[in-house]
Amino acid sequence: PEIGYFSLLNIESFIDYILLQELSKNVDAYRLSTYIYKDKESIDNRIYAGPIWDINHGYGNCNYGETWLTEGWLLEYNPEGGDQISFWWELLWNDTNFQTLFSERYQDLRSTIFSDNYINGIVDSITTHLGPSIDRNFSRWPLLGNYTWPNYYVFDSYEEEISYLKSWTSERLRWMDSELSTQITGDINLDGSVNVVDV
């Protein structure tokens, strides 16, 4: 409390990390499969979040932790039992200044790489690139129409999976829009404005 976390963390990396984990609603976020790192002091003495990895149980593809639902903050879902979210994630999340910067960053990304058109374009591009390997994959591993842990839905075709991914992501973004449309005010460096570059 005396020093504050802004001098200890690269805030931009934590904001982007949380935004991506919340967009995907990745059940392994914050509690498992989480990387943070620090360079040597001569380069930067702050802690960075990332890289993101292991999102196979994200985007509505998991039947526990309420991650199939498009609403709700994953960071706020912390039931009793194993695999608890570490307390410091909650402290960061509940900080007014962090929330303001988080909301601003989301608004910036929503008009670019978080736009529905951009995301659907990436999905379509990857699907096209994979081409015939999709059929070969399911020929080798006949998973379509069969339950595989911990999938929430069982799809009969790859096209159904792609449609679900796009629909789920779009609905998730609608919910995030509703939550982040009003920015929380905060002034990190007491200069009368709040901006990511001030961090």
Regions found by a protein language model. Give the residues of each.
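Middle-to-C-terminal accessory/interaction subdomains
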Residues: 1-31, 37-39, 44-184
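Residues in Ca2+-coordinating acidic/glycine-rich loops
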Residues: 25-27, 189-192
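Alpha-helical segments with a strong preference for the paired helices of cellulosomal dockerin domains
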Residues: 191-199
